[in-house]
Amino acid sequence: MSRILTFNAGSSTIKLGVFESAASEEVRPLAGGVLDLRVSPLELKFNHDGSRETIELDAAVSDDLGDVIDALLAWLEAKFEGEAFSAAGHRIVHGGLHFDAPVWLDEAIIDRLDELSPLAPLHQPAGLKLVRAMQRARPRLPQVACFDTAFHRTQAPLVTRMAIPRALHEEGVRRYGFHGLSYESIADTLRNEEPALLAKKLVVAHLGSGASLCAMEGGVSRDTSMGFSALDGIPMATRPGELDAGVPLYLQQQRGMSVDELQQWLYHECGLKGVSGISADARVLLESDAPEAREAIALFCFRTARDATLGMPRLIIPSLQVNMRAGEVPTDKDGRPMLKVPLNGL
C-alpha cells in the first residue's frame, strides 16, 4: 500500500489531498484539506474518514514556505502513523507549448516552467514555490506536475490562434485555456457514471473566484473561454474576463498607469469587485440590496449565458445539450445554486 500527496497551491491557501493505492487497486481518495496561510497560527481544515477537524500548525510563513511544509509534513506523517508518502502531485497551471501530459519534476523542468510565470502570475509562482519547498523537505520524494493547460491541447489549431502576426503565434502567443484539471475530472466522472452523456456535445462551466467555460465533445476540449492568460473569458471575482485591448492602452497612455499598476488592476480590481465596488464575494453581493451589487451579479450571469450560448457553441456545437458546473458556487440552505445563469434567456 502506498500513499500519495497532492497539492493545489494558491497565493493564500494550499489545498491538499491524500490518496491510497495498491498494486491491484485503483487510486482512492483518503483525506483532504485546506491550509490557510493568511492567519496566525496557521489553520489546516482537514477531512478524514467522514470527520472534520481544524488543526493549528506552529509555523511562520516565509518566502520559501520552508517552515510551513516542514510542519505540514510532520503532522501528516504522524496522522498516518509515520508512514512515508511515495510521491507528490502538483497542479501547475501553465504547461506552455512543451508540456501536454503529467511530467516528473527535476531542476531543469522546474526552471522551464518558471519561465512561464509571466503568463500566469497569480498561479505559476505559487505552485513552483511549493514544489521547491517539497524538494528541500523531502529531496528523495518523486514529484509530478499536472497541467491545467494540457486538457485543451485537443483543440483545433484554428481555435488556438489569435489574429496577430504569425511569428508571435509560433513563439507561443496563442490561446491555451485553463481549469483543465477541473474539466478533466468532470470528463472522467462522466466516463464512469454517465458514458452516454459524455458522448454528447456539452458546455461545462467552472465557476469560482476564477471562472471559465469549456465546450466538450466526446469528453475532450474543443474550445474554452479563457485564452492566452487567465484574464480572458467570462467575468470573475476580481478579473474582468473578455476586455477590449484598447482599455489597457487607454489607461497606460491617458491615465499614466505603469505595467505593474495595470497588472494589479487587471488581476485584482475588476470583475465582481470592480463592478460592485463592494466585494469580490458573490455571497456578499447576493445578500446586498445595493443596486451596484445586483448589477455585478446580473452582468456575470448575462456574460456567462452569452458566451455559453452564442460564443463557443456557434462554431462547434449546433445545439446546447447540457450545462454542468464545477468550482465553488454559492448555494442556499437546501444546497441549490444561488447564481442562476439564464442560458435559455438569449
Give each language-model segment a name.
Residues 4, 13-62, 227:
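Short glycine-rich, Thr/Ser-proximal phosphate-binding strand/loop in the N-terminal lobe
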Residues 4-6, 87-89, 144, 202-206:
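Short glycine-aspartate micro-motif
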Residues 74-86, 190-196, 308-318:
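Phosphate/pyrophosphate-binding loops at sites that engage ATP/ADP/AMP, CoA/4′-phosphopantetheine
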Residues 75-123, 142-144, 150-161:
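Short beta-strand-loop/turn "lid" adjacent to the catalytic site in phosphate-handling enzymes
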Residues 244-247, 251-278:
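Oxyanion-binding "anion nests"
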Residues 264, 268-311:
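Adenine-nucleotide phosphate-binding core of ATP-dependent small-molecule kinases
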